[in-house]
Design a protein with these regions (language model features):
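Signature of long, low-cysteine stretches enriched in small and polar/charged residues
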Residues: 77-114
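Sec-dependent N-terminal signal peptides
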Residues: 4-14
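Short secondary-structure junctions
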Residues: 29-40, 75-88
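Surface-exposed amphipathic alpha-helical segments
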Residues: 24-34, 120-145
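Sec/Tat signal peptide C-region and signal peptidase I cleavage site
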Residues: 14-20
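A short acidic-to-branched-hydrophobic micro-motif
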Residues: 43-71, 117-123
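Short, solvent-exposed coil/turn segments at beta-strand boundaries
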Residues: 29-31, 49-51, 64, 88-89, ...
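Short, surface-exposed coil-to-beta transition loops
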Residues: 40-44, 53-55, 98-107
């Protein structure tokens, strides 16, 4: 049991140092996010609550941009998802898909830190109105950025 606990702490310690210093991994965990993957080029986290299913990916790259990520996600989306449309608001590029649920993928337009791109994917039972969607985007970006 002691070896298991020691191994767990070593793994968690290694995971905690993979993201750049400016990423508050512990802060994300305190907000209920589970860190799934933490590499030098990306960090993937999930948050599952009774009402929400949220996936966050932070990409660390000086070569790409938000529009590139938007196109990449659209091309690589699972075939079970039907692409409905894409649009933007003042803070993000937004893609809307339909599977069993409505899936929204948002890519922040502005980088708080140069070379760190924030993408958030979340699901909803019903299609959101523009007003509700903008509210949700603001809440999620404020929480993650």
């Amino acid at each position: 049991m002691k070896k298991f606990i020691l191994g767990l702490f070593l793994i968690l310690g290694a995971v905690s140092i993979a993201a750049p210093e400016y990423v508050d991994v512990k802060g994300m965990e305190k907000k209920g996010y589970i860190i799934y993957k933490n590499k030098k080029d990306s960090l993937v986290a999930f948050k599952i609550t009774q009402n929400d299913r949220i996936g966050v990916t932070l990409y660390f790259s000086d070569k790409d941009n938000a529009e590139y990520l938007t196109n990449t996600f659209k091309r690589s989306a699972p075939s079970a998802l039907k692409f409905l449309d894409e649009f933007e608001n003042n803070r993000a590029y937004i893609q809307r898909f339909k599977g069993e649920l409505y899936i929204y993928n948002i890519i922040a337009k502005e980088q708080k830190v140069n070379g760190c791109y924030v993408t958030i994917t979340f699901s909803e039972i019903d299609d959101l109105t523009e007003e509700k969607l903008n509210e949700k985007i603001d809440i999620l970006l404020d929480e993650v950025e």
